[in-house]
Amino acid sequence: MTTTKDNSGLAALFANSSGPRQKPQRAGKVDPVRDQQEDKMEVEDEEEDEEEDEEDEEEDEEDEEDEEEKEEDDDDDDDEEEIEEPVIKKSKKNKKSKEESADLEDQYMAKLAEEVAEEKPMVAETSAEEIKVDEPESDSEDEPELDVDEETKKKLEATNKELDKADYTIFVGNVSSEVITDKTVYNNFKALFAAIGTVASVRFRSISFSKLLPRKVAFISQQFHSKRDTVNAYIVFKNVKSVKGALTLNGSVFKGFHMRVDSVAHPGAQDHKRCVFVGALDFEEQEESLWEAFSSCGDVEYVRIVRDPKTNVGKGFAYVQFKDVNSVEQALLLNGKGINELSKSTTNKRKLRVSRAKSQHSQERAKQADMKNIRNAKTEGLSRDEKSHFGRAQSRLGKAGKAQLQSIVQEGLRAKKEDGKVNLARSKRRGVKPNKNRVEKPGQSRAEKRKAMFGTPTNGAPGAGGKKKRLTTRSQKFKQDGGVKKDGDAKKDGPKKERDGSKKGSKKN
């Protein structure tokens, strides 16, 4: 009885085993298809366990019947035979358990083969989206590489489209603002460029409004700036060749305004040899007034007023580029003249400031040269050691300390008497102002200094050699005169006696 129960427990143990231990999966990696298959496997295992339990019960009943028959036949046998019976039974049951264990091993190996076959198609069926959702931060080497996010792909595609679109686009500046308000003017403007090639779209930018409102609200309500008569436009063609043909319209007049046409992908470079800088402009100045002012100097290629990107109001300066280099010399002669004298479209009396346009490379070089000159000026006239200390002080103190650093005093190299500098501590202590012209020689006594300053007195006169005569007191002078008072002395003594008598009388009273 005990052996059959042990065999049934073994069968149940192997039936429920899932094979070798696998890595625990995360919560996000649970596959619903695999869960369903595992549930089916568990149901099949339970059915097999029930069948095996029924077989074990039938075998137990047969064994009990055999034991009862043997007990009836062998009542008179010896004790040794009774002892041998369980040994014989054990040998039979061991053979049976070996056969059952062999069957269990075959079932176990078959199960493993089925699980391996099921796992291979499951890995192939997993999509890229399921991999993204699972565990992006896991470091396991068995996981497949993650794909690029769809958002980044969309951004890259959008940028590539914009770059491709720029090859088909042109910029048109100084366009009349009637293009926005009047539909007929808009159709005429579009037809002007449609004659060159088919136009895909037209966009208007740099529209200035009179009130600080959202752009869509201000555009719908048509609250445009009264002193800003022009806008900029972007025209997209369907053919790249049409862009080159549209560039020929640069400088053409539409509704009384000279248009500036340029490519977006390959804009024309500014040639500083053919360009002039115009300053001292009014903030509300228009390009058309500059076209009229400088057209007398030669053929103008374009006029560009630098404007604020938010308000679309000018910053007070512009660039005028000519088609010929010689026109620049004539344009420089307009320096200091009023713009109202040169153009009829403006009443502004500001005097223009015209100069040659500088190249960007030369400006950068000039800035670098200025910085070098500033650095060299601070270290000019210094020794090698002082320059090294100066550079160390700059790195330690920073910009603020660098600005405050004026004089360098190295430790152990203080000012000395031989350097021709006055000892300020001694001069302040004596109350004497330091004399920059006075030079103190080493080893000179005080008497020698006085001789050097005042000379040696002679015959009792200062500076002539000898000693000075001591000044006499008033009594000594009276004795020298023979005790006779002079008129001046009597006058001086008279009021004194009167004063003394008045004092004595006041005391007696």
From Swiss-Prot:
Domain RRM: 168-266, 274-359
Gene Ontology biological process: maturation of LSU-rRNA from tricistronic rRNA transcript (SSU-rRNA, 5.8S rRNA, LSU-rRNA)
Signal sequence region: none
Coiled-coil region: 33-114
Biased composition regions of type Basic residues, renumbered to the chain: 347-359, 426-436
SMART domains for the chain: RRM (SM00360)
PROSITE patterns: RRM
Cell location: Nucleus, Nucleolus
GO cellular component: nucleolus
Keyword entries, A-Z: Coiled coil, Nucleus, Repeat, Ribosome biogenesis, RNA-binding, rRNA processing
Region (Disordered): 1-152, 345-403, 419-509
A GO MF label: RNA binding
Biased composition (Basic and acidic residues): 28-40, 112-122, 361-389, 437-451, 478-503
Principal location listed in the UniProt entry: nucleus
Regions of compositional bias (Acidic residues) in chain numbering: 41-85, 136-150
Function: Involved in pre-25S rRNA processing.
UniProt record similarity statement: Belongs to the RRM RBM34 family.
Protein name, entry field: Nucleolar protein 12
Protein source organism: Yarrowia lipolytica (strain CLIB 122 / E 150) (Yeast)
Lineage of producing organism: Eukaryota, Fungi, Dikarya, Ascomycota, Saccharomycotina
